Regions:
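Alpha-helix N-cap/loop-to-helix boundary motif
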Residues: 193-207
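Active-site microenvironments that recognize anionic phosphate/pyrophosphate groups
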Residues: 1-129, 135-192, 199, 213-215, ...
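Extended C-terminal subregions enriched in glycine
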Residues: 203, 207-220
């Protein structure tokens, strides 16, 4: 695929001292922080000339070249949010995630596909319209590889459990750099979204909505959050699909900043006890839908 004007070549730098991978993308310095004239994802906007339910578009400001970055539009309703959509609509988003992931996994130059969402100014979201993104990597990112090498599986610790149903489990992460961190996984071991059955896709969508609703009740307002889907890369034969949802809030409106002692050492100090958070989230039932 031809490289677009302004795109940086896919040639990330690696810090020789730490192994940290850095993509230098100078073109993104010109990316607008907020739309100057209306929302580009609303009907009639720059990216959405016609009404839609869910759809995808190429990212105009890609972090990587060669069509590796896409935007997943959840709804043409600017004020909708993933957790507020009907279960059917939310499942259609999971279906689109699976479809676009499969397209990219089919590329010979793709090893790993990441689906993610940034929601809220505190985590860098620049457009309020409900949307997520897809990044297609030609290698397996370190964290993805580390979780697979460690044999990640859903937690069996009842003290960390938040919710379990016929198809899906939700737990608080045992040890996370973020004060709030949830892990959602299908009960059946599958590696990719495309391998989920229709019932499992519905179950995953409902579990994600439930988790976000519980967090909203817990904080008494919708917190900023980051959500991403961990899928089996092309280099692996076995992995357990899971979704992570994290928030930088440690209390309503109070950020838990990751500062010098943590950045410099890679060790973190969290003020929220995961087991206590799980108990609170179990008690903060999600709103009926």
């Amino acid at each position: 695929m031809a490289q677009r004007d302004g795109e940086a070549p896919l040639n990330p730098r690696v810090d020789s001292a730490t192994g940290i991978v850095v993509h230098v993308v100078g073109s993104r310095q010109n990316r607008p922080n907020l739309p100057a004239t209306g929302c580009p994802f609303c009907v009639g906007g720059l990216e959405a000339p016609q009404p839609y339910s869910t759809t995808w578009i190429a990212n105009r400001w890609p972090a990587m070249p060669d069509g590796r970055c896409e935007v997943i539009l959840y709804s043409d309703d600017h004020d909708a949010r993933f957790m507020s959509l009907s279960h059917t609509h939310a499942t259609s988003i999971v279906d689109l995630w699976a479809e676009r992931s499969s397209v990219h996994f089919a590329r010979a130059d793709t090893s790993s596909v990441l689906i993610f969402e940034n929601s809220g100014r505190d985590v860098g979201a620049t457009i309020d319209h409900p949307h997520g993104q897809l990044y297609s990597f030609d290698h397996v990112p370190h964290r993805t590889a580390a979780r697979i090498d460690a044999g990640w599986v859903p937690s069996l610790d009842d003290q960390l459990s938040v919710r379990t149903d016929e198809t899906t489990t939700t737990s608080v992460a045992y040890a996370s750099a973020y004060p709030v961190a949830l892990e959602i996984a299908p009960r059946r071991r599958v590696g990719r979204l495309a391998e989920l059955s229709p019932d499992e896709r519905l179950g995953l969508a409902v579990a994600m909505q439930d988790a976000l609703q519980r967090l909203t009740t817990y904080f008494d307002t919708t917190p900023p959050y980051m959500l991403w889907v961990n899928q089996r890369p092309s280099t692996s034969t076995d992995a357990w699909l899971n979704v992570e949802i994290v928030s930088p809030w440690r209390a309503p409106g109070v950020m838990r900043y990751i500062a010098a002692a943590e950045v410099s050492t890679g060790e973190y100090f969290t003020p929220l006890v995961p087991e206590q958070l799980a108990r609170s989230l179990r008690e903060h039932l999600s709103s009926p839908r």
